[in-house]
Regions:
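C-terminus-biased signal that marks the final domain/tail of proteins
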Residues: 1-131
Length: 131
């Protein structure tokens, strides 16, 4: 599965294989009444809202940050699938853990990328001015 948070256009897609037994922690944290730096939903929503300061230029920054990330996920998925099939034959528990670890690593990369993107958007587009 490819999972997104908030806005499908601005959200990165997180690869989650059938067989994961836990959701990455940053995707489990969300309280609409309380911002959290540890929440993927808040990180993505923050970027989504900042894009409205300068949509035409900001969406270029979004694409420059998100596309390489998702392209890498697509490439890695093939290798993860191969590793999973091999492990599943020998040790199903380790195979499941591989999927959990991969999902967590992808989620962590998304958080890092979107935190950096948030900082870029704040810096570049404060008061609707490109800096």
């Amino acid at each position: 599965y490819w999972v997104f948070q908030d806005n499908a256009y601005t959200s990165p897609y997180l690869p989650l294989f059938t067989g994961v037994s836990r959701i990455p922690e940053v995707y489990s944290i969300y309280d609409p009444q309380q911002y959290s730096d540890n929440s993927a939903r808040w990180a993505i929503d923050f970027v989504d809202n900042l894009l409205y300061l300068n949509w035409q230029d900001g969406k270029k920054d979004l694409e420059a940050a998100r596309k390489p990330l998702e392209d890498d996920f697509f490439k890695q998925n093939t290798e993860i699938e191969k590793q999973y099939l091999e492990l599943q034959k020998k040790n199903p528990k380790k195979a499941r853990e591989l999927l959990n670890t991969y999902a967590q690593e992808c989620a962590d990369r998304i958080m890092h990328t979107y935190t950096q993107l948030r900082n870029t958007l704040i810096t570049k587009y404060t008061n609707n001015k490109m800096r």
